[in-house]
Amino acid sequence: MKIDIHTHILPKEWPDLEKRFGYGGWVQLQQQGKGEAKMMKDGKVFRVIQQNCWDPEVRIREMNQKGVTVQALSTVPVMFSYWAKPKDTLELCQFLNNDLAATVARYPRRFVGLGTLPMQAPGLAVEEMERCVKELGFPGIQIGSHINMWDLNDPELFPIYTAAERLNCSLFVHPWDMQMDGRMAKYWLPWLVGMPSETTTAICSMIMGGVFEKFPKLKVCFAHGGGAFPFTIGRIAHGFNMRPDLCARDNSSDPRKYLGSFYTDSLVHDPLSLKLLTDVIGKDRVILGTDYPFPLGEQEPGKLIESMADFDEETKDKLTAGNALTFLGLERKLFE
């Protein structure tokens, strides 16, 4: 069994949000003919997507070809829209979540849903989380690596974490809103360097901000193998202990204490990196994630995990399925 925690999906179409809300910055979908569309933002192409980004039947066909049993579906992070007026973001979130729920309902043995929330308005976010879990049946939510000027340790977000614990709602943290201009404007650096940096910042913020201390039952998984965090934990812990005046202001516990308190996906593209990741984060805390259907994703889902001579069959099963089931609070028999 293979359960992919990290995949993205969009509706086939959605309303003209600039006309609906009366201001720019929204992502629009421009169909280019059968099987291809452009995601447009402020008149510029953000990304060209293929039919597998919106058509569940195409996805299932490709899943069958690659041996993937289940995909956890989440929106493309540029759709988060945390910058917008909260009521407008809420309306978009409800549209995206309803579309996601309809897809899961059609194929409940192949898909599970990770919803999206208007995180810039925690009260509204909690209400939509309640709806996602209780009405739509989602086991989790995808959130960004920061919410405008809030890092993930900001007390404004604590009501969301309280609700997530109460509802047993898992959080999948995805980097977004990287610096795109200046020195980062070339070589695809926002995706190659900016995303790992965003994820590392999110992990450090939650650790040093005491989030895992305050919310010990919170289930969090970070995308892209936790960014640079597994490789730089030594530097982070050393800096914490050498400069507690800067690093221990909100939490006095060594960062290493929280290894094992959160999950990452497995998307590191390299056997040495995957070995390090499981050594640092734990073999019980790494989950197969591919970033399907995008080019930076793992093109052969689970192949790297299966190729690892250091992993026994029990470990491989944990990484490809068991850890995802634990993180999402689901039973294997639902998908067998």
UniProtKB/Swiss-Prot annotation:
GO term, biological process aspect, one: secondary metabolic process
Residues given in the record as substrate binding sites: R47
One GO CC term on file: cytosol
Pathway linked to the protein: Secondary metabolite metabolism; quinolate metabolism
EC number: 4.1.1.45
InterPro entries, per database record: ACMSD (IPR032465), Amidohydro-rel (IPR006680), Metal_Hydrolase (IPR032466)
Enzyme class: lyase
Influence of pH: Optimum pH is 6.
Keyword annotations: Decarboxylase, Lyase, Metal-binding, Zinc
Residues involved in Zn(2+) binding: H6, H8, H174, D291
Family to which this protein belongs: Belongs to the metallo-dependent hydrolases superfamily. ACMSD family.
This protein's name: 2-amino-3-carboxymuconate-6-semialdehyde decarboxylase
Species of origin: Rattus norvegicus
Lineage: Eukaryota, Metazoa, Chordata, Craniata, Vertebrata
